Structure formats: structure tokens, C-alpha cells
Curated annotation (Swiss-Prot):
Lineage: Eukaryota, Metazoa, Chordata, Craniata, Vertebrata
Family: Belongs to the MsrB Met sulfoxide reductase family.
Active site: 95
UniProt protein name: Methionine-R-sulfoxide reductase B1
Note on cofactor: Binds 1 zinc ion per subunit.
Enzyme class: oxidoreductase
Subcellular location field: Cytoplasm; Nucleus; Cytoplasm, Cytoskeleton
Database matches in PANTHER family: METHIONINE-R-SULFOXIDE REDUCTASE B1 (PTHR46755:SF5)
Amino acid sequence: MSFCSFFGGEVFQNHFEPGVYVCAKCGYELFSSRSKYAHSSPWPAFTETIHADSVAKRPEHNRSEALKVSCGKCGNGLGHEFLNDGPKPGQSRFUIFSSSLKFVPKGKETSASQGH
């Protein structure tokens, strides 16, 4: 079940190349392609962030199983974390808007794409 409006254009939903997904606004590293997996929702899904501070989380009103997530560096809105809804028991599912991400292919990482 999803809590976001879907407007289409989710270019990273079926994107599985090796690399890093960074914040579209500031370039901070958010998710590795290793944590991305196929899910039935229309948004890209990840099981974990790259760094403990990659995202900031706040409760979603009236939905104890969902947290709103934003970039841990600049505050750019990213989507949601759904607790215990990942591919394995106990894992989360990060449901992220493609428009909030930029993809950096493996081997093309720079200090700018890492948010430094």
C-alpha cells in the first residue's frame, strides 16, 4: 500500500545499474544500488541507506509503520520508509521519488557526488 500520489515519471523504478543514488539537490550519498530491489510500488525501493545520516526521519501522521524521509544534509524531501516492509523480515522499504535522486554510475563517483 502506498501513501504518496503517483504522477508517473519514476525513471529509477526499474533501474538496476551499479552505482550510487545521491540527493538531486545537494549530491549527498543516499543509497547504493546494492540495496535496491524490485517492488510492486511505482517508486524505486531500497532496504538501507549508505550512511547512518544519509536521511533524516520523522513520523508520518496516523501511520505508525511509515516515516517521512528527507536528505540528511540539505532536507530535500525524498519519500518514505516503511518499517518491516522490506524483502526480508525486519528490513525496511525506503520508497523514494526518482525526482529527488541523481544516479552516479560505479567508477564515476567524485567528491561532489558524495556531498563533500
